[in-house]
Amino acid sequence: MASLIYRQLLTNSYTVELSDEINTIGSEKSQNITINPGPFAQTNYAPVTWSHGEVNDSTTIEPVLDGPYQPTSFKPPSDYWILLNPTNQQVVLEGTNKTDIWIALLLVEPNVTNQSRQYTLFGETKQITIENNTNKWKFFEMFRSNVSSEFQHKRTLTSDTKLAGFLKHYNSVWTFHGETPHATTDYSSTSNLSEVETTIHVEFYIISRSQESKCVEYINTGLPPMQNTRNIVPVALSSRSVTYQRAQVSEDIIISKTSLWKEMQYNRDIIIRFKFNNSIIKLGGLGYKWSEISFKAANYQYNYLRDGEQVTAHTTCSVNGVNNFSYNGGLLPTHFSISRYEVIKENSYVYVDYWDDSQAFRNMVYVRSLAANLNSVKCSGGNYNFQMPVGAWPVMSGGAVSLHFAGVTLSTQFTDFVSLNSLRFRFSLTVEEPPFSILRTRVSGLYGLPASNPNSGHEYYEIAGRFSLISLVPSNDDYQTPIMNSITVRQDLERQLGDLREEFNSLSQEIAITQLIDLALLPLDMFSMFSGIKSTIDAAKSMATKVMKKFKRSGLATSISELTGSLSNAASSVSRSSSIRSNISSISEWTDVSEQIAGSSDSVRNISTQTSAISRRLRLREITTQTEGMNDIDISAAVLKTKIDRSTHIRPDTLPDIITESSEKFIPKRAYRVLKDDEVMEADVDGKFFAYKVDTFEEVPFDVDKFVDLVTDSPVISAIIDFKTLKNLNDNYGITRSQALDLIRSDPRVLRDFINQNNPIIKNRIEQLILQCRL
């Protein structure tokens, strides 16, 4: 049968190569990580003992003359003079906003007669007439107001210092004209000053407009003497008076830099959104008692705008120092009680781990000078109804706390796909009005926030603030430290798996039922399963090894392993006796279920509960019991094989995940039956049960004890054609006893005959099973 593929996986009959282990370690997320508090985040402090580079003193000084800088293209800031210092370049500067202004500065050497020269301006070749009959240098300012016009000679600067200037201010572009040492400024108006970009072909300096007198002095008399030692720039005493500038929303400042590493200070305005999560567990019994109401860590991903930039952020919220409360309304089974419910108060802390996709979190490995300032937020509790079978429901309501920023450290958030270097913000709590109470009980007037409904209908709570840190990062911005590279492998794999899942699910409707049943009868093993994948025939053994390793950690394999272990222990502990039945191990497997049934009432509720508990384990019997009929495992393997053959996204690294996921998720709504003489007993995973006669399909009372005995002694049959379908088929078409038995046993030949006859009832049932084979 097709289920040979799953049986073969469960036998673990393939070796594991060291190279496969190494690849797995590099591509899979970490396992068995204990994190406290909260299952997603842990705190660690960064080392701060590395050697510093160049360190500025505490006085911020804006130099008069900043530079020199290499030729470049950029959008210069407003209110800063660009002091141009050419050597012998013919084109000094090009500037335009591509709407109403095009400016070019040309340099002409002394003693040049009237002549036409060729220049390349803004990518266009132009012939321009120039003349310089003086012994000084001349800067020709060429201007046009639209892209189709020709350049006109607008201004001339005659200079013996060979310096020119360019400034963006108010709604104009400013330059120098006249003759040194009496050159002055002039302007050209524009309606779009902010978009003016420049291409500078010479070395240049930057001077604040507040020091414009110095710029005029340099243009007319030349630059001051320069010393070629590091960090020494002649500045005027007046430059120590710094014009106040408002801090930017996002700031990346280089503190120090060497050849390989640099210290970057990141200042960020952030918006933190978080929510609480909780776990509410109800005790068994009559439905009047609750076991636990507790806080759980909660992940939240969101987007927001920061200085016009879209930011993607991720937070994890967890709590520490909770207070355990309880309520006991009485000793009777119908008395309301809560064994434990958690409340956060003044002695508690709330941790919010924050990460966003900005540069600040890209290389957060070595960090110092970490500081933050955040607002406070009030969190109020909502109502939670304790739904009891009879009587008025108790309601837990109210409660509130305020969160106040109390510190920040480094942390790591762990999600299903990636680990994130984060900042952990710690908040202390103060209790607020109103207190919380439990309506219809004696509990009232207690302060704090209970875990029953901590979000009170809010999608999230929001805190605004700002953080600053200095991080040691590679000097090359294109390089990422290995801690982030190691986790992107899993992200890429998940992206591939996502595409594969979408493709698999879309293929379900394209599979022919007759082809599926024919395929389900073939002995599909590991190697035939891979035959549809290109370029993997030679690597079949390696492929099987990878699939085997992944499958060993699946829930199905774990259940089989636990079943085998429990049966072995039971068999070894039973003394040999003639009274012991040959299937003692099977009896032990069902003993706990039988004991539960023995102590239960005959109500429909309890029978449903017990059959549901049994049916969860019937799948193991489906694997371990070989029958001649078709089962759900056969259909799962056949659908999987068909989809693998048709898929365009299958790759060797995605196949193990797909096969493992299919074993867990294909056909989740399964039904099983056992056959004894003329009676059939059937149960599904939802706890629904039927007992009926083969001849008439008349329902008879369902005996749970008899069902357990039959499961122990007889093969478990997959209900490919379930009771409702059989009854519908008999009522509309009428079927013989022989056909009924064949359909009950899931005989594939009879199924094929009904489908070939285009029977809509049988065909629809098989199509429903195929559509359940989704990832």
Swiss-Prot record:
GO terms for cellular component: host cell endoplasmic reticulum-Golgi intermediate compartment; host cell plasma membrane; host cell rough endoplasmic reticulum; host cytoskeleton; membrane; viral outer capsid
UniProt key word Zinc-finger: no
Disulfide bond positions: 317-379
Intervals of motif DGE motif: 307-309
Region Spike head, annotated ranges: 65-223
Motif (YGL motif): 447-449
Coiled-coil regions listed in the entry: 483-510
Record flagged with keyword Membrane: yes
InterPro entries to which the protein is assigned, alphabetical: ConA-like_dom_sf, Rota_A_VP4, Rota_VP4_MID, Rota_VP4_MID_sf, VP4_concanavalin-like, VP4_helical
Residue ranges of the region described as Spike body and stalk (antigen domain): 247-478
Positions of the UniProt region annotated as Spike foot: 509-775
Keywords (A to Z) from UniProt: Capsid protein, Coiled coil, Disulfide bond, Hemagglutinin, Host cell membrane, Host cytoplasm, Host cytoskeleton, Host endoplasmic reticulum, Host membrane, Host-virus interaction, Membrane, Outer capsid protein, Viral attachment to host cell, Viral penetration into host cytoplasm, Viral penetration via permeabilization of host membrane, Virion, Virus entry into host cell
Gene Ontology biological process terms, A to Z: permeabilization of host organelle membrane involved in viral entry into host cell; virion attachment to host cell
Residues under site feature: Cleavage: 230-231, 240-241, 246-247
Family: Belongs to the rotavirus VP4 family.
Miscellaneous notes: This strain probably does not use sialic acid to attach to the host cell.
Name recorded for this polypeptide: Outer capsid protein VP4
Protein's organism: Rotavirus A (strain RVA/Human/United Kingdom/ST3/1975/G4P2A[6]) (RV-A)
